[in-house]
Amino acid sequence: FQAYQKVARYANLIIAVSTTDADYLRKQFPNQRIEFVPCFHENNRITAEPGKSDYILYHGKLSVIENERAVLFLTKHVFSQLKHTCIIAGMNPTRLIREAAAPYPHIKVEANPSKERMDALIHNAQIHMLITFQDTGLKLKLLNSLFAGRHTIVNHLMLAGSGLDPLC
């Protein structure tokens, strides 16, 4: 982000996708026009399924370092301590993710699910467990979980600048 600041000072308009980013940019560039534009997403109504299911879900692109870090943390400190089925689903899970989950029969890694399968996992999960270690704006997986899931548990960085705090 800081690498782009040298160029951003010449912009006529800077658009931020989180209120945190907009506030930061307004301080960095007080003479620039900074606008907050909420994230676009495909959800237009709540589609959460009624009832209960028997698993906790983490989903994301698992080859991304930030997501790998989140999964490794959840596996070691949360999922390993539970008795409930925990599903880690997403594209291209790393070797580290697979190895971390392997000793625990109740933790399942679902690699490269189809869109239909991922939608089913999201809709049917009892709990969505989403954490991040970077406050890099609104996460689409958070929006998808809130629109399509039953319950969502997140850490404070997942909500940073999103305005969604009351929903989690």
Predicted regions and their residues:
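Acidic, amphipathic alpha-helical patches
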Residues: 4, 115-119, 142
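Alpha-helix capping/helix-boundary segments
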Residues: 20-22, 93-94, 152, 158-159
